[in-house]
Amino acid sequence: MSQAESSAAGSGVSANELDPEDTKIVVLARSTRARIGAAEGAAVRDTDGRTYAAATVALPSLRLSALQAAVAAAVSSGAPGLEAAAVVNADGSEPDAEAVAAVRDL
């Protein structure tokens, strides 16, 4: 996990301690969550430096964590791999294992 991922997942690293690129994905995750009032917001950065943000998807026929949705956006855009991820939620809990596995898969 990158420092940004750990920070947003509740490791105690503040956004002030991150480099500017990692701070950017934390801000993207936070603003994505706030924009629609979602339970969770996430952002990922691919190995080309492009960023993808998403919020929790909670439809009757489709459920994705914000991190899974952000990874799906990256994959569907042709991202070759991921170098960082951030997750922001109301309770400061860490992302579930399936969501983290999606990051590692790419």
Predicted regions and their residues:
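Charge-rich, low-complexity amphipathic helices
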Residues: R50-T51, V71, G92-D96
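C-terminal binding/interaction regions
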Residues: S2-R35, S77-L106
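A short, polar/charged loop-to-alpha-helix boundary motif
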Residues: P60-A73
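Short, glycine-rich nucleotide/cofactor-binding loops
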Residues: T56-R63, D91
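N-terminal first-folded block
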Residues: P20-A53, A58
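Residue-level detector of alpha-helical recognition elements and their boundaries
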Residues: V44, R63-L64, A85
